[in-house]
Amino acid sequence: GQSAMPFLHGFRRIVLEYQPLVDELLGLLATPDTGGQSSLESPACLDSDKSQLSAVRRVLERETHSPFYQEGVSYALLKVTELGLVPAAEILLEFGADLSFEDPVTYYTPLHMAVLRNQPDVVELLVQHGADINRRDRIHESSPLDLASEEPERLPCLRRLLQLGADVNAADKNGKTALLHALASSDSGQIHNTDSICLLLEGGADVTAATKDGDTVFTYVIYLLGEMAYSYTEEEAEDIERFCFRVTQLLLAHGANPSQCPASESLTHFCLKSFKDYFPLLRFLLESGAAYNCSLHGPSCWSGFHIAFEHLCWHLSRFDDETYSSDLIQKGQTLLELMMASSQAIQLPSNFEVNTSSCRFHGEKVQTLFCSLKQLERSPQALKHLCRVFIRQRLKPWPVGDKIKALPLPDRLKWYLLIDHTAAGHEDL
């Protein structure tokens, strides 16, 4: 059809009309490699060699008035950009190469190409010569910063772009920022993007950024943790868990709220629903001050106490295994106490009740936990509870465990402050 023609026409023009000039220029910059073939990729590429660069100048002077000179010199810039040949790029710019020239196939500009090939020095050269540092490509709408944040290998370009003043919070039309790109590209196969995420956060990336689809910084962490249960080796699962923990630490350190609404985007809510599986991360969230209720609407929207008892009853109605049950109850008790100890007044949903009749096993233990919670809600708080809340608050930030162990207090008090029913008694004190 008519609409497809310009693209094909542009594609053919590369091959037919300005390709000879491009080939001649690149041929001058190549060095003969061992196979007798000229190679641009070889590390011995002597792009600083004066005679090569003089030869390039002579060709450009000779061809200045030839048809398609502008396209040829601009396309050559794309190619030397990919190879990181700074002196050659400088000459091409001097001879009129267009910084906004788009590759006829990918529609990337030289700056995009420099980032994709991780050439920070070329990135700097292009920006200093006036390349638009925040320009989005036509196909994917990615900025140079987006591309730099997607691969750990491009960290040098990411650092350079931020130093050169790239807008760290620029977003595409769907609201996706470079930080959301970095998080989204940290999929299970490739989870080493922590440094990029850290660099963006230190550069002022907004932790409250969200896409039009409602994806937030925690969407990707939740997705990865959910994936962990499937088809991974033990080692891969540990890698994912470590990565998610580290990223959550970074996000919280920069003010992210893991207890937001809707519940589907709340990391706290996600961990509460399966507290047995994500216990260390959940402990970290609570000890770092995350709300155990919806931070926007309070316990009427969702409540950590409600979710915890639901989880306990559901599992205890299905599994009879004694070690499994006792581990679950210990973690449940620890979780309930962590939530109780996070503030002086506890917040429960109104008319909060727990029906333990569904628990086929250990219903009485769950009932006891529930009664201690209701007791705390109804009566004036005991001094020891208030002291625990106060001391733990003073020992923040996370982790508070080692700080408690260092206090000049009797072991029994330390144990009460530590809140860890999964630890075997007092041996570690």
Residue ranges and their predicted role:
Residues 3-24, 30-31, 271-284, 288-429:
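Cullin-RING E3 adaptor/co-adaptor recruitment helices
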Residues 3-93, 97:
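N-terminal segments that cap or nucleate solenoid repeat domains
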Residues 46-48, 79-85, 113-119, 147-154, ...:
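Ankyrin repeat A-helix N-terminal signature
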Residues 55, 87-88, 121-122, 153-157, ...:
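Conserved ankyrin/ankyrin-like repeat signature
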Residues 58-64, 90-98, 124-132, 159-167, ...:
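Ankyrin repeat domain, specifically the short helix-to-loop turn at the C-terminus of the second helix
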Residues 68-69, 99-103, 133-137, 168-171, ...:
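Ankyrin repeat boundary signal
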Residues 73, 106-107, 140-141, 175, ...:
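Start-of-repeat signature of ankyrin repeats
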Residues 138, 150-211, 219:
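Solenoidal tandem-repeat scaffolds enriched in leucines and small polar residues
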